[in-house]
């Protein structure tokens, strides 16, 4: 099984790009493949925007970056054609998930963090669906702390909390399902949510079940798996 690293380059660089690096165990075998989005093109930026905060006689500049190791079977022909395009919202959801794990001072990024990342991003169709069904960010945070507990106040989360095994499997499931669909378009946040749901013993799945998400709701999400934006308001205006 090959490992793909999704790298989110900080905003401080000029002409930032996102790359997927294939790693087969040795640095010499890695290659860089642009992770593209039809919305923003190949120069897609998925980091949390850098921001400056001004305090009297104090100036600070912060910038966040994210690196995610995504396991997925290597294409038979060795080409990059099997790597699906990711929507900007899906990429941001993963980045926000890692930051949520860091906020909670967790040592790794789990399925519960991916779920929180989807809700933090908040503008995708599936995020709106979750909120409409009572699955909110605050509820997920509370359930996460109830299920996994609080981290030690003196513990410092890694700069890039690694993905847990269930989280890796959830992302691999999303990528594989997108490849199997043979549908043009990007890998959306719906694939990520259903990837979390597919891991039956994961924290993310348990939290979703606790908040009322079930197989019927999962089937509703499946109907719009290839849509990240609700365009129904445009259809009504035509």
UniProtKB/Swiss-Prot annotation:
Record remark: domains: The MYFF motif is functionally important for stabilization of the overall ClpPR complex.
Cell location: Plastid, Chloroplast
Main localization of the protein described in the UniProt heading: plastid
One Pfam family linked to the record: Clp_N
Region (Repeat 2): 163-228
Transit peptide: 1-64
One CC-aspect GO term: chloroplast stroma
Role noted for this protein: Accessory protein regulating the assembly of the plastidial Clp protease system. CLPT1 first binds to the heptameric P-ring containing the CLP3-6 subunits followed by CLPT2, and only then does the P-ring combine with the R-ring composed of the clpP1 and CLPR1-4 subunits. Once the core complex is fully assembled, it then associates to the CLPC chaperone partner to form the functional protease. CLPT1 and CLPT2 are partially redundant.
Keyword set, alphabetical order: Chloroplast, Plastid, Repeat, Transit peptide
Protein's name according to its UniProt entry: ATP-dependent Clp protease ATP-binding subunit CLPT1, chloroplastic
Null mutant phenotype: No visible phenotype. Clpt1 and clpt2 double mutants show delayed development, reduced plant growth, and virescent, serrated leaves. Clpt1 and clpt2 double mutants are seedling lethal under autotrophic conditions.
InterPro entries in UniProt: Clp_N_dom_sf, Clp_R_dom, CLPT1/2
Repeat is among the record's keywords: yes
Ranges of residues in domain Clp R: 83-228
């Amino acid at each position: 099984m090959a490992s793909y690293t999704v790298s989110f380059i900080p905003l401080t660089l000029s002409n930032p790009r996102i790359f997927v690096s294939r790693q087969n165990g040795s640095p010499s075998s890695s290659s860089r493949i642009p992770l593209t989005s039809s919305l923003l093109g190949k120069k897609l930026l998925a980091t949390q925007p850098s921001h400056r905060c001004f305090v009297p006689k104090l100036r600070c500049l912060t910038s966040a970056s994210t690196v995610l190791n995504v396991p997925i079977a290597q294409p038979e022909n060795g080409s990059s054609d099997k790597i699906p395009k990711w929507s900007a919202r899906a990429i941001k959801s993963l980045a926000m998930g890692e930051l949520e794990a860091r906020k909670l001072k967790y040592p790794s990024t789990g399925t519960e963090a991916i779920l929180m990342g989807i809700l933090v991003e908040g503008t995708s169709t599936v995020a709106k669906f979750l909120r409409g069904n009572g699955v909110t960010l605050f509820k997920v945070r509370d359930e996460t702390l109830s299920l996994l507990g609080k981290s030690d106040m003196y513990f410092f989360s890694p700069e890039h909390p690694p993905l847990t095994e269930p989280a890796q499997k959830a992302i691999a499931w999303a990528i594989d399902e997108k490849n199997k669909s043979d549908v043009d378009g990007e890998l959306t946040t719906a694939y990520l949510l259903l990837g979390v749901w597919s891991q039956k013993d994961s924290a993310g799945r348990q939290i979703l079940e606790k908040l009322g998400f079930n197989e019927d709701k999962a089937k509703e999400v499946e109907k719009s798996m290839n849509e990240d934006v609700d365009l129904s308001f445009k259809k009504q205006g035509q």
